[in-house]
Every structure is written in C-alpha cells, then in structure tokens.
A protein has these predicted regions:
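Flexible, acidic active-site loops/lids enriched in D/E/S/T/G that coordinate Mg2+ and/or position polar
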Residues: 68-149, 155
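Short acidic loop-to-helix transition motifs that present clustered carboxylates
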Residues: 94-97, 216, 235-242
C-alpha cells in the first residue's frame, strides 16, 4: 500500500502493522530457536498482510462477503506454504457464515518434525467497515505452541458473544496490586470509570469509553452518559476497539460491552503484547 502508513510495535516477537485503514496484527508465542522462530514469525506476518491487502481491494464496494472470501483465500494460500503443523482452534464459523478457515481445519505442510501450532484468527474483523470504505477493520492471527505435556495452547470459546472490559497498562498494574479495586466486568461501568480516572490522573469527564453500538450495550451507554464521561461508539471492529486503550495513537481509555467471543481471545492476546488488560 504505497499510501499506507506502517507502524511496528515489537514486544517479545509480537508485531502490529497498520497498512492504511486495514490493520494486520500478529500475536505469536513459542519456545523455538530464535532463527526458526523469526522465519515462521515472518510467515505468519505475511499471511495476515496478504489477507489485509487482498481484502482492501473490496474497500467501499458494498460486498463484505467478497472481502472476507478474499482474506480467507489469501491466508490459506500462505498457510499452504508454511512448514508448520497448525490447527485452527478459533476461526470462521456458523455465526459469520464465512467462506472458510474453520475451527478444526489443518493448516501448513504438516511435514514431519515441523512445529505444532494452535492458531486463532480472524481474516477480517469488520467486513462491514471494509464494504463501506470505513476504517477499523483488522486481519489478525494469534499462534502458540502447546507446552510439553499439554494438548493445546489456545482453546475454542463455546459462545458467540462475551461481555468485555479492556483497559491500559497503568490500570492493569493497579488492579494486580490491589484486586479489591472495582475494575471488573461485574462492577458497574460508572465505578470502573471513576477508579480508572484516578489512576490515569484525569477528571471523570475526560475519560473516553469506547462501546460497540448495539442495543445489548444500551445499559453501558446510559451509565457513561449519566456520569458525563466521553463516549465513542463504533459500528463494527471489536478487536481494534478492545486494543485501543493500550495504543498510544488513540485517546481511548476503556473499552466495555458485549461483543464477539472469538474476537475476545484475539484482542486479549493483543492486549497482552501491548501491556494492557482485558476481562471477558
């Protein structure tokens, strides 16, 4: 993308790239030799980058299924060349009526001696955004090697939707030191905002909360407005939104509300890389 800006964030082999309005996130963890890790790391990166670039051809063309199909096809094509034994544990499914990359699908060459990976992915989170030519779509992969003696490193979430709360590193660290703080998905969002405001050194009215614009999140929207905090509502793009509190390029302090369950796993992996926290 000649007109796209590229942002690299490295943290123990984790890489986030922004290409124009399509983001590519790679979350990767292993105990392999550094050289081997580096090669496979870049192959995962190329898979997500390829998906983002192919789906971007459908920006603003009103066909979200075509954008998703292009991304799936691009990722699968890259997986076919990767010397790994991969299995998709979180992928496309019934909820999306997606064209491929389903849970349980085997990816990679599965050559003898190649590393075993559990793979969680979303070829495009925010296909509606792509179809409308809007920002905040993301193509991402989280991959992990199971520990010795363990059957899996990532697990399927047996739900379509989850309640989520995401926050920046300073809030996460404070909650770790004092678990009694009302920083919880079970606490009223008004209390979470008040505590977060103190930790961030802000007035309650200056705290920005991002929420997915859905009727199921109306109770959160009402609390944020009643408290007088800033509210930023989004139509789609659950993964990007949940990671926003940990990205210095945004002014989002908290993300709250009910969104996709598979997306919760991917955004949690991203938050771990970025230092923030997420509950779901």
């Amino acid at each position: 993308a000649s007109d796209g800006k590229i942002l690299f964030i490295w943290a123990s082999g984790n890489l986030l790239i922004l290409i124009g309005d399509i983001e590519v996130l790679l979350v990767y963890g292993s105990l392999m030799h550094k050289d081997e890790e580096r090669v496979i790391e870049l192959e995962f990166l190329r898979a997500t980058e390829n998906a983002a670039l192919h789906s971007s051809h459908w920006m603003g063309r009103g066909d979200k299924e075509a954008a998703d199909y292009a991304a799936c096809d691009a990722i699968r094509g890259m997986f076919d060349l990767m010397d790994i034994r991969g299995e998709i544990v979180i992928g496309e499914g019934i909820k999306d009526e997606a064209p491929g990359l389903f849970i349980g699908e085997k990816v990679g060459t599965w050559a003898e001696g190649s590393p075993r990976f559990d793979v969680a992915l979303d070829p495009v989170d925010g296909t509606t955004n792509v179809s409308k030519g809007m920002p905040n779509s993301i193509s991402c992969i989280a991959a992990a090697i199971p520990e010795e003696g363990e059957d899996c490193a990532l697990q399927e979430i047996p739900a379509f939707y989850m309640n989520k709360l995401a926050y920046p590193e300073v809030v996460r660290q404070a909650w770790i030191k004092d678990p009694s703080l009302p920083i919880s998905i079970d606490a009223p969002i008004s209390e979470v905002i008040k505590v977060s405001a103190k930790l961030l050194g802000k007035n309650v009215r200056d705290v920005t909360v991002m929420v997915l614009d859905r009727p199921r999140n109306e109770f959160i929207i009402e609390q944020v407005r009643s408290l007088g905090s800033k509210l930023r509502m989004i139509a789609d793009g659950d993964i990007t939104a949940a990671m926003a509190p940990s990205l210095s390029s945004t002014d989002v302090d908290l993300y709250a509300g009910i969104g996709g369950a598979p997306e919760a796993v991917l955004s949690a992996a991203g938050q771990r890389c970025l230092g923030g926290g997420q509950q779901a």
